[in-house]
């Protein structure tokens, strides 16, 4: 199940977001302090982390920067009533925030933004898996190439196949 972390110092905001997101089939974890949210990062792997921009002990960008170090694949969103341009730029540049959502929010926009973030998260994971598969296949090909080179050096001509004009493999001495 896809896990989402919500961090906001206002319990009413967390409750409203949980009610909005739970019906989507996502596992929603809510934290009303940065400290408790940090513990959540150690216990769970999140696809999406949504943080309030302004909280008493730390701002959301600072928290999301830390979250990025702990869970680099998780998509990060900021939710804020303070949607000034400099806040957005700071969030994007420092925490590589995927999206900046404003309070009060539009339910459809929040759900669509989180779904889009989840889709991107899954693509990132799939991309990594495919890169790992390609790397493994390249390593296997290099090993086979080394084996062919070894065989060729021990038995010159062993790796060459002689074919007739119709594609049939010819067996025997065909040098003359």
Regions found by a protein language model. Give the residues of each.
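Two-component/phosphorelay signaling modules centered on CheY-like receiver
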Residues: 2, 11-30
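Acidic catalytic/metal-coordinating carboxylates
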Residues: 32-33, 59-62
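Receiver (REC) domain active-site loop signature in two-component systems and cognate sites
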Residues: 55
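C-terminal output helix
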Residues: 105-114, 118, 122
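C-terminal output/effector regions of signal-responsive regulators
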Residues: 129-176
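Short amphipathic alpha-helix used as the core "switch/output" element in two-component signaling
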Residues: 39, 61-73, 90
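Acidic, metal-coordinating helix/loop segments flanking the phosphotransfer/catalytic sites
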Residues: 30-48
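Active-site residues of response regulator receiver
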Residues: 52, 80
């Amino acid at each position: 199940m896809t896990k989402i972390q919500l961090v906001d110092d206002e319990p009413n905001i967390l409750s409203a977001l949980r009610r909005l997101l739970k019906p989507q089939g996502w596992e929603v974890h809510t934290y009303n302090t940065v400290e408790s949210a940090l513990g959540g990062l150690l216990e769970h792997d999140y696809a999406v982390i949504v943080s309030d921009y302004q909280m008493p002990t730390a701002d959301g960008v600072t928290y999301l920067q830390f979250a990025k170090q702990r869970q680099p694949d998780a998509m990060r969103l900021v939710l804020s009533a303070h949607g000034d341009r400099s806040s957005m730029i700071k969030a994007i540049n420092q925490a590589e925030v995927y999206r900046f959502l404003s309070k009060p929010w539009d339910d459809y926009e929040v759900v669509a933004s989180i779904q889009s973030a989840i889709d991107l998260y899954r693509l990132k994971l799939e991309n990594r898996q495919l890169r790992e598969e390609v790397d493994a296949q390249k390593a296997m090909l290099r090993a086979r190439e080394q084996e062919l080179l070894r065989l060729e050096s021990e038995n010159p001509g062993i790796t060459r196949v002689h074919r007739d004009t119709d594609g049939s493999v010819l067996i025997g001495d065909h040098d003359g």
